[in-house]
Amino acid sequence: MKLRSLASPRMMLALGLVAATASCATPAPGDALLSQLEAKQFFKYAGPNADRMRAEIREKGWPALFGDSGRVFGADGLTLAKGGVTKFVEKLRPFLEGQGVKIPELKDDLRQESYSVLVEGASLPIWTKDDLARELGAQPGITGALAAARSFALVNKLLEGAKSQERAYAIYSGAALSVMFLTDDLIAVMKADPVAVPKFIPYRPTTDFPFFGQPQQ
């Protein structure tokens, strides 16, 4: 006796339509970006936020990159300029030590006309008397920008000394400055995304007035 077919022609047609619909489904905006980020270990430090970050990037794409990935920390330039560099590095301590960095002895030396950080007793200028004159003259805000650039440079020197692949990049929303830690591979992925906004791409801050390294196009 022959066994009856387990699937009727109608059922087979329905299954075929479902499969065809699935294969033609429109990918989410961030699918390709998410795949590249996964390959470059973007979520390595995200901890319990990793799945939420993945979902947001898949749904929104590039704009969702700057969430709670464990790579982003506040870095207000004005706070840094007012003697906040040592506290800033201390805030980054868990991340830096995770990269193998040995934090040196740091001490703020904030004076009326200058600010330096003593790194194991050696003076690292954050802003000088001449910088203050520029601040009070035609370049308001320059001490904050210089403090950020020189603080980031200090952090990157520590990372380089520890042989870490991560580097401190600045991200600026127009209202606040933050530091975002990225590898060369990750910054390349971010720059190559077709919907990337050039002036919001993370950048290495410089001491060059007036944009201090921030892309403008």
For the regions a language model picked out, list residue spans one by one.
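Contiguous interface-forming segments/domains that mediate binding rather than catalysis
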Residues: 26-217
